Amino acid sequence: MKLLILALFLMSQSVFAHNALVWGGPGACQDGCIESAVHVTKLAGLDPMIVTPENFDASLFETAKVWVQPGGKSGAASNAMGPKIREEIKKFISQGGGYVGFCAGAFLTTPKVGQTSVTGLGIIDGKTKVYRRAKGYPSVEKMITPDGFRYHYWEGGPWFSFNSVQLKKINVKSRYFTTKGINAVETTYGKGRISVSGTHPEAPQWWYDDSHIVDIDGLDNQIASDMIKWAAKN
């Protein structure tokens, strides 16, 4: 029954022209990552469509302003997309579309996913590495931002490593307080805008509640929404 409902939902989406695409295929976690990405996309004033390998078509980009990549498993997402979908996403961005990624969505942006041999999108030069080992997560991490300290939900996300030349093309939005490693960045690829975060600004309250952790400065959904607005030029 659940599969039937999901199928009907995906079919209903195809009737309308959507201006935001959210990956909902393999690699997007099934524990609220897709729904959270959809929520902050709507908060940004956009009309999202969930995209999977089964319903993907390049024509979807004709009305889209931004591609949103949720948290989950970046390697699984890349493999499920395959070369065809990855190239279509890159083409979309280079021609002026936006890309927003949270956690796994940040891992996916570099030429290789993290420190693996899995092919990434290659829309951000540099490398991604896991901020710290998985033991003891999820957690709330203290971040350094241009506006002062901020606390973010973290669950296995990356930090970015750039050389001096690559860094000139990057606008650093936040760093991990403990290591000063780069967490969130804005940059461009061709005519398009990219905004990604190793942490989860889209995290809903129930993620914190389930893990018995507290974000002392409140939810960061507005940050996630602003990322989408900027990338979508909305």
Identify the role of each PLM range:
Residues 3-12:
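Sec-dependent N-terminal signal peptides
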Residues 13-17:
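Sec/Tat signal peptide C-region and signal peptidase I cleavage site
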Residues 19-25:
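Short beta-strand segments enriched in small/hydrophobic residues
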Residues 21, 30-113:
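Helical hinge/lid and interdomain linker segments adjacent to catalytic or ligand-binding clefts
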Residues 76-77, 108-111, 117, 131-132, ...:
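Short catalytic/ligand-binding loop motif for oxyanion handling, primarily in non-cytosolic enzymes
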Residues 90, 199-234:
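Extracellular ligand-binding/catalytic regions of CAZymes and related secreted enzymes
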Residues 110-151:
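Class I SAM-dependent methyltransferase SAM-binding "motif I" and its flanking Rossmann-like core
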Residues 138-206:
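Catalytic beta-strand/loop cores that center a nucleophilic Ser/Cys/Thr
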